């Protein structure tokens, strides 16, 4: 996401803006990416090199502690807050949603898969109000979704990974994904890899292998 934003600024499609990275994991992975810069593809290297040469083009800041994170919600004027927290059910992003959802001048952009029943999914489904920390919050901010940015492998990628096993596992458990997609993926494993013991666990069930 950060690379996309920097690239938009580079192409003059976004004005000079402030970007706040408010996620310990996102901060760590960003610094890790910088460390292994040479492993990036050519386009990413070019974008990153441009940013190093034009550090003032983007006001980029990494947030360290929780109090500093909460202070972001008092910002006046335009800013982008990147806060990673899966389904929006926990972590720093919840405080940002509590503060920013009620205001129509704000926008929330969700880039990852949101499971049914999660706060993120309710926002994607364009509900009018949500409950956060026991408080009813009106959703007046505009909600946007961008596909294709998930860090998870797709069906083809997962099947390729499974094909790398030298010996087929005794049992495969499909534990991530909604019911329909899990059933389809389990069927693919059985048919394409000829692995018969593929289980989709149900809530509170236990298995002994």
Residue ranges: model-predicted function:
Residues 1-209:
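Acidic/His-rich, metal-assisted hydrolase cores and their charged scaffolds
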């Amino acid at each position: 996401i950060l690379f996309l934003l920097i690239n938009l600024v580079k192409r003059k499609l976004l004005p000079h803006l402030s970007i706040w990275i408010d996620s310990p994991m996102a901060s760590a992975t960003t610094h890790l990416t910088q460390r292994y810069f040479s492993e990036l593809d050519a386009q990413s290297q070019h974008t990153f090199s441009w940013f190093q040469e034009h550090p003032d083009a983007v006001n980029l800041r990494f947030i360290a502690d929780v109090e500093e994170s909460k202070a972001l919600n008092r910002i006046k004027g335009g800013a982008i807050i990147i806060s990673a927290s899966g389904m929006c059910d926990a972590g720093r992003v919840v405080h940002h949603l509590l503060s920013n959802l009620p205001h129509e001048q704000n926008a929330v952009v969700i880039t990852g898969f949101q499971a049914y029943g999660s706060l993120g999914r309710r926002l994607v489904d364009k509900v009018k109000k949500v409950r956060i920390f026991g408080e009813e919050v009106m959703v007046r901010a505009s909600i946007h979704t961008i596909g294709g940015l998930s860090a998870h492998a797709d069906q083809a990628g997962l099947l390729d990974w499974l094909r790398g096993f030298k010996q087929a596992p005794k049992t495969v458990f499909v534990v991530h994904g909604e019911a329909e997609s899990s059933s389809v993926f389990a069927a693919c494993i059985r048919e394409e890899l000829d692995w018969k013991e593929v289980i989709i666990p149900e809530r509170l069930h236990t298995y002994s292998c």
